[in-house]
Amino acid sequence: MSAEQHAPNKRQRELLDKHLELVIEENKVTNLTRIVDWESAQVLHVEDSLAGLPEVEEALEGPYLDMGSGAGFPGIPLAIMTGRETLLADSVGKKTRALDSFAAELGIDDIVSTYHGRIEDLSLQQPNHFSLVTARALSSLASLLERASPLLAKGGRLVCYKTHSESEELEHAREIARKLGMEFVSSRGFTLSDGETSRAIIVFRKR
């Protein structure tokens, strides 16, 4: 699918911009992000979140979990673009309360909800439940696999947003994946529109 086919329509762009406005405003009272100027945030938060759309759209239909959602990236942009039932999980109550407020303000609280707590506890409450899990700059690939695998349904995908992809880390993650009943699907590196920020999208699937 081409970049044009992944581009937001007018309504989606309005919601993406509104979300970013809400984040910048809320950041004055709640520490959500260190990136607060509009242009940088558009690239490093919004564009970065949407960069995973090709991989996200290959996932099976079904509920979506964003681990360590923070300010709602990539969870809210991906919910806006895909319309998936979305759960934004974070261990910090101030952040999940802000995310609830964002979803209500954006009018997407019919598909977006939050979970305040540890991912390990969520996996006990909703095992094998999610068709898609995302994690953005959160932890090592091996750690993400260990957290996500109990939550994923058979055939479900873990889409990892990384600042870079090191072959040694990926090889170790592939070994861990096999032990967890997961398998490596793909790795794609790219540069954001600022011309200097490198990113990688790495995907695993539950067998």
PLM regions and their residue ranges:
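Conserved S-adenosyl-L-methionine
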Residues: 66-70
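Class I SAM-dependent transferase core
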Residues: 1-65, 94-97, 101-110
